[in-house]
Amino acid sequence: MSSVPASAYLTLAIILFCIGLFGALTKRNTVIVLVCIELMLNAANLNFVAFSKLGLFPNLTGQIFSLFTMAVAAAEAAVGLAILIALYRNRTTVHVDEMDTLKG
């Protein structure tokens, strides 16, 4: 049984990160922007796990750091959605273009 080469993991991570970056920079819906940021974080996690497993000195450091990053990403998503709900109640929109002032 052959294993998957490291270049396949890194290529997938680059593709995922580029899709997330493109979505975060071009989309105007705040929920979609948050999802794209999560996609970029998951691409970074894939790199951590790939280098941890397939690097010159395989160890668990990358996998542990990936779990820590997933916990931070979950907290970021919860705070982001809470802010989004508060903004929606105040402005009745979730578009990034219309959220330009701090106090309205």
From Swiss-Prot:
Q: Which GO terms describe its cellular component?
A: NADH dehydrogenase complex; plasma membrane
PANTHER family per record: NADH-UBIQUINONE OXIDOREDUCTASE CHAIN 4L, NADH-UBIQUINONE OXIDOREDUCTASE SUBUNIT ND4L
Cite a single GO BP annotation. ATP synthesis coupled electron transport
Q: What is its EC number?
A: 7.1.1.-
Function description: NDH-1 shuttles electrons from NADH, via FMN and iron-sulfur (Fe-S) centers, to quinones in the respiratory chain. The immediate electron acceptor for the enzyme in this species is believed to be a menaquinone. Couples the redox reaction to proton translocation (for every two electrons transferred, four hydrogen ions are translocated across the cytoplasmic membrane), and thus conserves the redox energy in a proton gradient.
Indicate whether Thylakoid appears among the record's keywords.
Answer: no
Entries under Pfam families matching the protein? Oxidored_q2
Membrane topology of this protein: Multi-pass membrane protein
- What assembly does the database describe for this protein? NDH-1 is composed of 14 different subunits. Subunits NuoA, H, J, K, L, M, N constitute the membrane sector of the complex.
Catalyzed reactions per annotation:
a quinone + NADH + 5 H(+)(in) = a quinol + NAD(+) + 4 H(+)(out)
- Supply the name of the protein: NADH-quinone oxidoreductase subunit K
TM region positions: 4-24, 31-51, 67-87
GO MF terms, alphabetically ordered: NADH:ubiquinone reductase (non-electrogenic) activity; quinone binding
Give the family this protein belongs to, as stated in its UniProt record: Belongs to the complex I subunit 4L family.
Main localization, broad class:
membrane
* Gene3D superfamilies in the cross-refs: 1.10.287.3510
The record's keywords, sorted A to Z, are:
Cell membrane, Membrane, NAD, Quinone, Translocase, Transmembrane, Transmembrane helix, Transport
Q: Where is it localised?
A: Cell membrane
